[in-house]
């Protein structure tokens, strides 16, 4: 089996291409989920202040037999804290029982309030202080990203967006790549695979490779150059989602999955959300 792949970010830092998402997991659930994830080989964990499970993540990491240097921990600045990123980060660090965060992401731009440039400037300072290794954003559209770059001169290393076979965001993905911004997929299985896992192309590829539909979709993200963070608290599913290193999809197969794109957003519209 091939080793899990890593991605080099534009700031020189390296992150695993496949991580564990913990959205909607309780503090108790997240402890057992992370224990299982580390056991099967995950080294990247993606949480957020808004998930209200950073304390559980912290306990799991505290008890882990994996060295801190081997782990890649992401958390996120919530919308209410755009004017106080320092306090928000220190609160997250305390809950996570960590000295630094590998990747700190602004969770939403919230253009109705329009503090995202101010928040970004604060995140830049926190990175300079060594409290954060890398800084990025989630759910930013091209015009939000361009404004950050124009007003601060600092480009996010990551843009984590809703991305799955029904919502492929190819224009944004390409724009990110042109600006050396790594695209990361949230809700990569389209919230449990509804409308995706039953597609003929997905089922046919699952049969061909002896894999599950979820594994095919995760491999599609990986082979499309995306960082991907499938969420699960089920031990068997956590293991299944990581068992994707012994096959690859070819160009034609990726192209067939590309045809599933409907521009179908399952989550909020970033131009409207918050505020």
Swiss-Prot record:
Chain positions recorded as substrate binding sites: 107
Induction pattern: Expression is activated by the HTH-type transcriptional regulator YqhC. Expression is not significantly altered upon methylglyoxal addition. Induced by glyoxal.
Protein localization: Cytoplasm
Active site: 51
Alphabetical list of SUPFAM superfamilies matching this protein: NAD(P)-linked oxidoreductase
A GO cellular-component term linked to this record: cytosol
Role noted for this protein: Aldo-keto reductase that significantly contributes to cellular methylglyoxal detoxification by catalyzing the NADPH-dependent conversion of methylglyoxal to acetol. It also exhibits fairly high activity with glyoxal. Shows broad specificity and can use aromatic aldehydes such as 4-nitrobenzaldehyde, 3-nitrobenzaldehyde and benzaldehyde, and phenylglyoxal. Shows beta-keto ester reductase activity toward ethyl acetoacetate and a variety of 2-substituted derivatives.
Subunit note: Monomer.
Record family assignment: Belongs to the aldo/keto reductase family.
This protein's name: Methylglyoxal reductase DkgA
UniProt organism field: Escherichia coli (strain K12)
Lineage start: Bacteria, Pseudomonadati, Pseudomonadota, Gammaproteobacteria, Enterobacterales
Gene (UniProt): dkgA
């Amino acid at each position: 089996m091939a080793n899990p792949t890593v991605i080099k970010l534009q700031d020189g830092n390296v992150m695993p291409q496949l991580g564990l998402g913990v959205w909607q997991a309780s503090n108790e659930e997240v402890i057992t989920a992370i224990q299982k994830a580390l056991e099967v080989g995950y080294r990247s964990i993606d949480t957020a202040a808004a998930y209200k499970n950073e304390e559980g993540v912290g306990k799991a990491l505290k008890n882990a037999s994996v060295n801190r240097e081997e782990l890649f921990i992401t958390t996120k600045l919530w919308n209410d804290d755009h004017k106080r990123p320092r306090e928000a980060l220190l609160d997250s660090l305390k809950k996570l029982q960590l000295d630094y965060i590998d990747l700190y992401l602004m969770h939403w731009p919230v253009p109705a309030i329009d503090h995202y440039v101010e928040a970004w400037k604060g995140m830049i300072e926190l990175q300079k202080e060594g409290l954060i290794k890398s800084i990025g954003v989630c759910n930013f559209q091209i015009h939000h990203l361009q404004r950050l770059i124009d007003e601060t001169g600092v480009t996010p290393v990551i843009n984590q967006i809703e991305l799955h076979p029904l919502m492929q965001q190819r224009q944004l993905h390409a724009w990110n790549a042109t600006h050396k911004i790594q695209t990361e997929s949230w809700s990569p299985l389209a919230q449990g695979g509804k409308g995706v896992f039953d597609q003929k192309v997905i089922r046919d590829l699952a049969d061909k490779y002896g894999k599950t539909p979820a594994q095919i979709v995760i491999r599609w993200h990986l082979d499309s150059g995306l960082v991907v963070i499938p969420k699960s608290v089920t031990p068997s599913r956590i293991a299944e989602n990581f068992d994707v290193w012994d096959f690859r999809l070819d160009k034609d197969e990726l192209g067939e999955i590309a045809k599933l794109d409907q521009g179908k957003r399952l989550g909020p519209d970033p131009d409207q959300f918050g505020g």
